[in-house]
Regions:
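Hydrophobic transmembrane helical bundles of multi-pass organellar membrane proteins
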Residues: 1-145
Length: 145
């Protein structure tokens, strides 16, 4: 890691440009990751269950917990799907981490059906803007609680 991202660039372009490049890459990657995590977990409709104080266990089953604590966003946007590597289908990512992201759109149909059958809320925002707005509303609610 250090040699690929720091040593080789320092040798090739000097330490100032290498450091600047490293900082830009780190900032951009951090921005993408933080946006994905915030829009997938910290929005209206997702839950934040606390474990039982005696057993230290979550009440729901693992799969139900994944659905309750996660939201999808911009699932009809091919550009967001490509840019985020399918992480806008975050619920399916949590439920099926070993399945390639190219299958998430099809898997999401199955997950929606199962959620409907078992009366589990499936949180999905049709656009990134709607998810971002929900995130802001949720933060405001947390800040005034």
């Amino acid at each position: 890691y250090v040699s690929v991202y720091l040593v080789i660039p320092v040798i090739m372009v000097g330490w100032i440009k290498a450091l600047l490049g490293f900082l830009i890459i780190t900032f951009v990657c951090g921005l993408f990751i933080s946006v994905v995590f915030q829009l997938a977990h910290v929005v209206q409709g997702t839950q934040f269950p606390k474990p039982n104080s005696l057993s230290n266990k979550i009440e729901n089953e693992w799969a139900v917990h994944q659905v309750n604590t996660t939201a999808n966003f911009a699932t009809h946007s091919k550009s967001m799907y490509w840019l985020l590597g399918g992480l806008n289908f975050h619920m399916e990512h949590h439920l099926f981490p070993r399945i390639s992201h190219i299958h998430y759109p099809q898997v999401s149909k199955f997950v929606k059906e199962v959620c409907q059958e078992y009366d589990i809320v499936y949180v999905e925002y049709t656009s990134m803007f709607k998810a971002f707005w929900s995130h802001l509303v949720h933060l405001r609610r947390l800040g005034t609680a």
